[in-house]
């Protein structure tokens, strides 16, 4: 295309009496003439304010879309009508440019004098008729618009939305801005200031409650006659809900309400809404808001989805913390609370800054708990909707493998419901966890009542699962020793639950599993349990090794057997031979005739020997090979 189309081309392609604007009006059902005049006046005002008439319509696609979005939002049309409003703005831009070519001297004089009133009036008188707009605009396809990245769009936006003086020469001729180093800094500053003004305007809408909460509640697609019925049927019946807003693109009003009320009462948010200059002075507040949101996301994943494999947890966390999802979170939180469409504003410059500033402001004013708990409920709802497979896995029982993460089921659902494979119960478990919860009573919903019993005495405790980690066996035993005044140090105790001996791992699983049932623990003596059991926890005192001298019913076994064909004494014979080789000297006859009966009689005469440790043998080369001339007693009883 070598140049702009001539006026003759427009007249040839024109349908007599029925232009493109008239077709678009019929398509939009825009038949109210009074309202149409208001629309035309507002359209020309925006075109002149942002100087869209200085360039061809094909060169400023992004600017036309933004002006069309403003007009569509102000006149209450849905997003589906965006293309029609873009065509109306495009037609108006071309009409204005043609009218200025016809009266170049008059427009140049008006611009030089700095008065735009006569200009607007002359434009309004010529651009509202269908004869001045070619129907080729209506038939224009999207292929006419050159694709551009976000950076290119931002650069184009910064070049087009500049003050008029930056494009005007001394003789009144308008030149496009050249992307030189000298002109880029004012352009970027002006563009960034416009973004700051948009953020300030949106915060002002939230603080002043432009859209009343009652109106937002009425428009909430989640509103139903019965919350319990909704909790069990919303996930499976989402397509049946009659609403123009997709369910998965919104957040229930009862989850957003607490944050919106805090924003209205926030002093910091009010200061931001009244900021006249740059909002860069709130840079640290943005960091506070961003870190708070990321912390809330990590808390939700660790709190409700810790039974998933680490790669899945890492993936969900990374996707939820991505700028795209955070921008979507900003739209879901504040989209219904303002008259402007947040989806048409830049994500990095407007949507994310709005989210960070508002969350940082209410965290500064009200603290972490009143802010992060409602925010965590919203994030939990979004994760449940976006990742239904993860939510179903969160309802499954944990694997018995010790390498798996401990399951943490929802606090309001008992274990028998979680083990049920019924979809209705699983959906109920999923939805009930998103119910609002007061920050000051957050721990009350996840407390666990623990009852510890020792003999005929018992003591009840309250275990806070959110703020405390699971105790170890030794910690519980040490506290119970002081609680129940256990002074007998000769007995070894263990912790039992449902007649099962607990170790540190099983005790942690018991305390980490969220349920409304009580935990009953019993302190018992474990001295009768075989020591070979590898699951026996470390007791208060180490278990005492029993010896042969403490068992009077055991027969006396000589060190050197008199009869070699006795099978019961063969095991000690090999043991004696080893001791003889260690001592490096043959044992005397009197030592070889010494039997364990001597040790048995000695232990019977001294009742305190079983309370003391058995001395280790001391090997020498004299005829008294062992201490006190006695043989050592074996540590473990032989299996005869």
UniProtKB/Swiss-Prot annotation:
Transmembrane segments: none annotated. Residues 621-631 have a biased composition (Polar residues). It comes from the Eukaryota. The keyword Secreted does not apply. It is found in: Cytoplasm; Nucleus. Coiled coil: none annotated. Residues 118-128, 588-608 have a biased composition (Low complexity). Belongs to the VHR1 family. Transcription factor that binds to the VHRE consensus sequence in promoters of VHT1 and BIO5, and regulates their biotin-dependent expression. One of its GO terms (biological process) is regulation of transcription by RNA polymerase II. The modification Phosphoserine is found at residue 409. The gene is VHR1. GO terms for cellular component: cytoplasm; nucleus. Residues 118-139, 580-640 are annotated as: Disordered. Induction: By stress, probably through the induction by the transcription factor PDR1. Keywords: Cytoplasm, DNA-binding, Nucleus, Phosphoprotein, Transcription, Transcription regulation. This is Transcription factor VHR1. GO terms for molecular function: DNA-binding transcription factor activity, RNA polymerase II-specific; RNA polymerase II transcription regulatory region sequence-specific DNA binding. It holds the Pfam family Vhr1. Present with 279 molecules/cell in log phase SD medium.
